[in-house]
Every structure is written in C-alpha cells, then in structure tokens.
A protein has these predicted regions:
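Structural motif
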Residues: 8, 31, 73-74
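Glycine/small-residue-rich loop that forms an oxyanion/phosphate-binding "nest" at active or ligand-binding sites
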Residues: 60-76
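Glycine-rich, highly charged phosphate/nucleotide-binding loops
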Residues: 44-64
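Short, polar loop motifs at secondary-structure junctions
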Residues: 32-38
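Short, structured coil segments at secondary-structure junctions
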Residues: 24, 42-45
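Short, flexible loop segments at the rims of nucleotide/cofactor-binding pockets, characterized by
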Residues: 6-7, 47-52, 76
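Eukaryote-specific long, low-complexity intrinsically disordered regions
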Residues: 4, 39-41
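A short, flexible N-terminal coil/short beta segment enriched in small residues
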Residues: 1-27
Length: 76
C-alpha cells in the first residue's frame, strides 16, 4: 500500500512541495480553501485536490477515512 500524504496548502511553497512529490510513489491529498487555490495546482497522477474550508470536524473525518502517514501544513 502506498503511503498517504495530506498537504494542507494554499501557498506558493505548498505548490512547490506538490511538484517535488510528483514522481514519488505516494497518494497525495491536497486541501486548499478555495476553487481558485485548486486551479493554481497542476494535475499529477498521484494527486487528489480538495477545495473547501475544513473545520475541525471535517479534518478529523478526513484523518479517520484516509489515515495519512504524514500531514504537511503549508498554509500561511
């Protein structure tokens, strides 16, 4: 099973991290607050983009459902 990474993004640094992980054998989930933020991210095979503001309950739900190996906070 591939490692699961959740990157909480919305910054240019987050987009750079996403590009850096393009060739890794991981399942990468990226959450951004807006559709505009999602549009700035280039598609890649191992990437799922979620465009919505996540409150604590939604974050907990995501963690329980996907069980990420690693969480990266690349927000402001």
């Amino acid at each position: 099973m591939k490692p699961v990474i959740w990157l909480i993004g919305g910054t240019s640094e987050g987009r750079a991290l996403i590009k850096a992980m393009a060739d890794l054998d991981v399942k990468l989930f990226v959450s951004v607050a807006t559709e505009y933020g999602a549009e700035l991210i280039e598609a890649q095979d191992n990437l799922t983009i979620m465009a919505e503001r996540m409150d604590l309950a939604k974050m907990r739900q995501f963690l329980q459902e996907h069980k990420p190996t690693c969480v990266i906070d690349a927000t402001h």
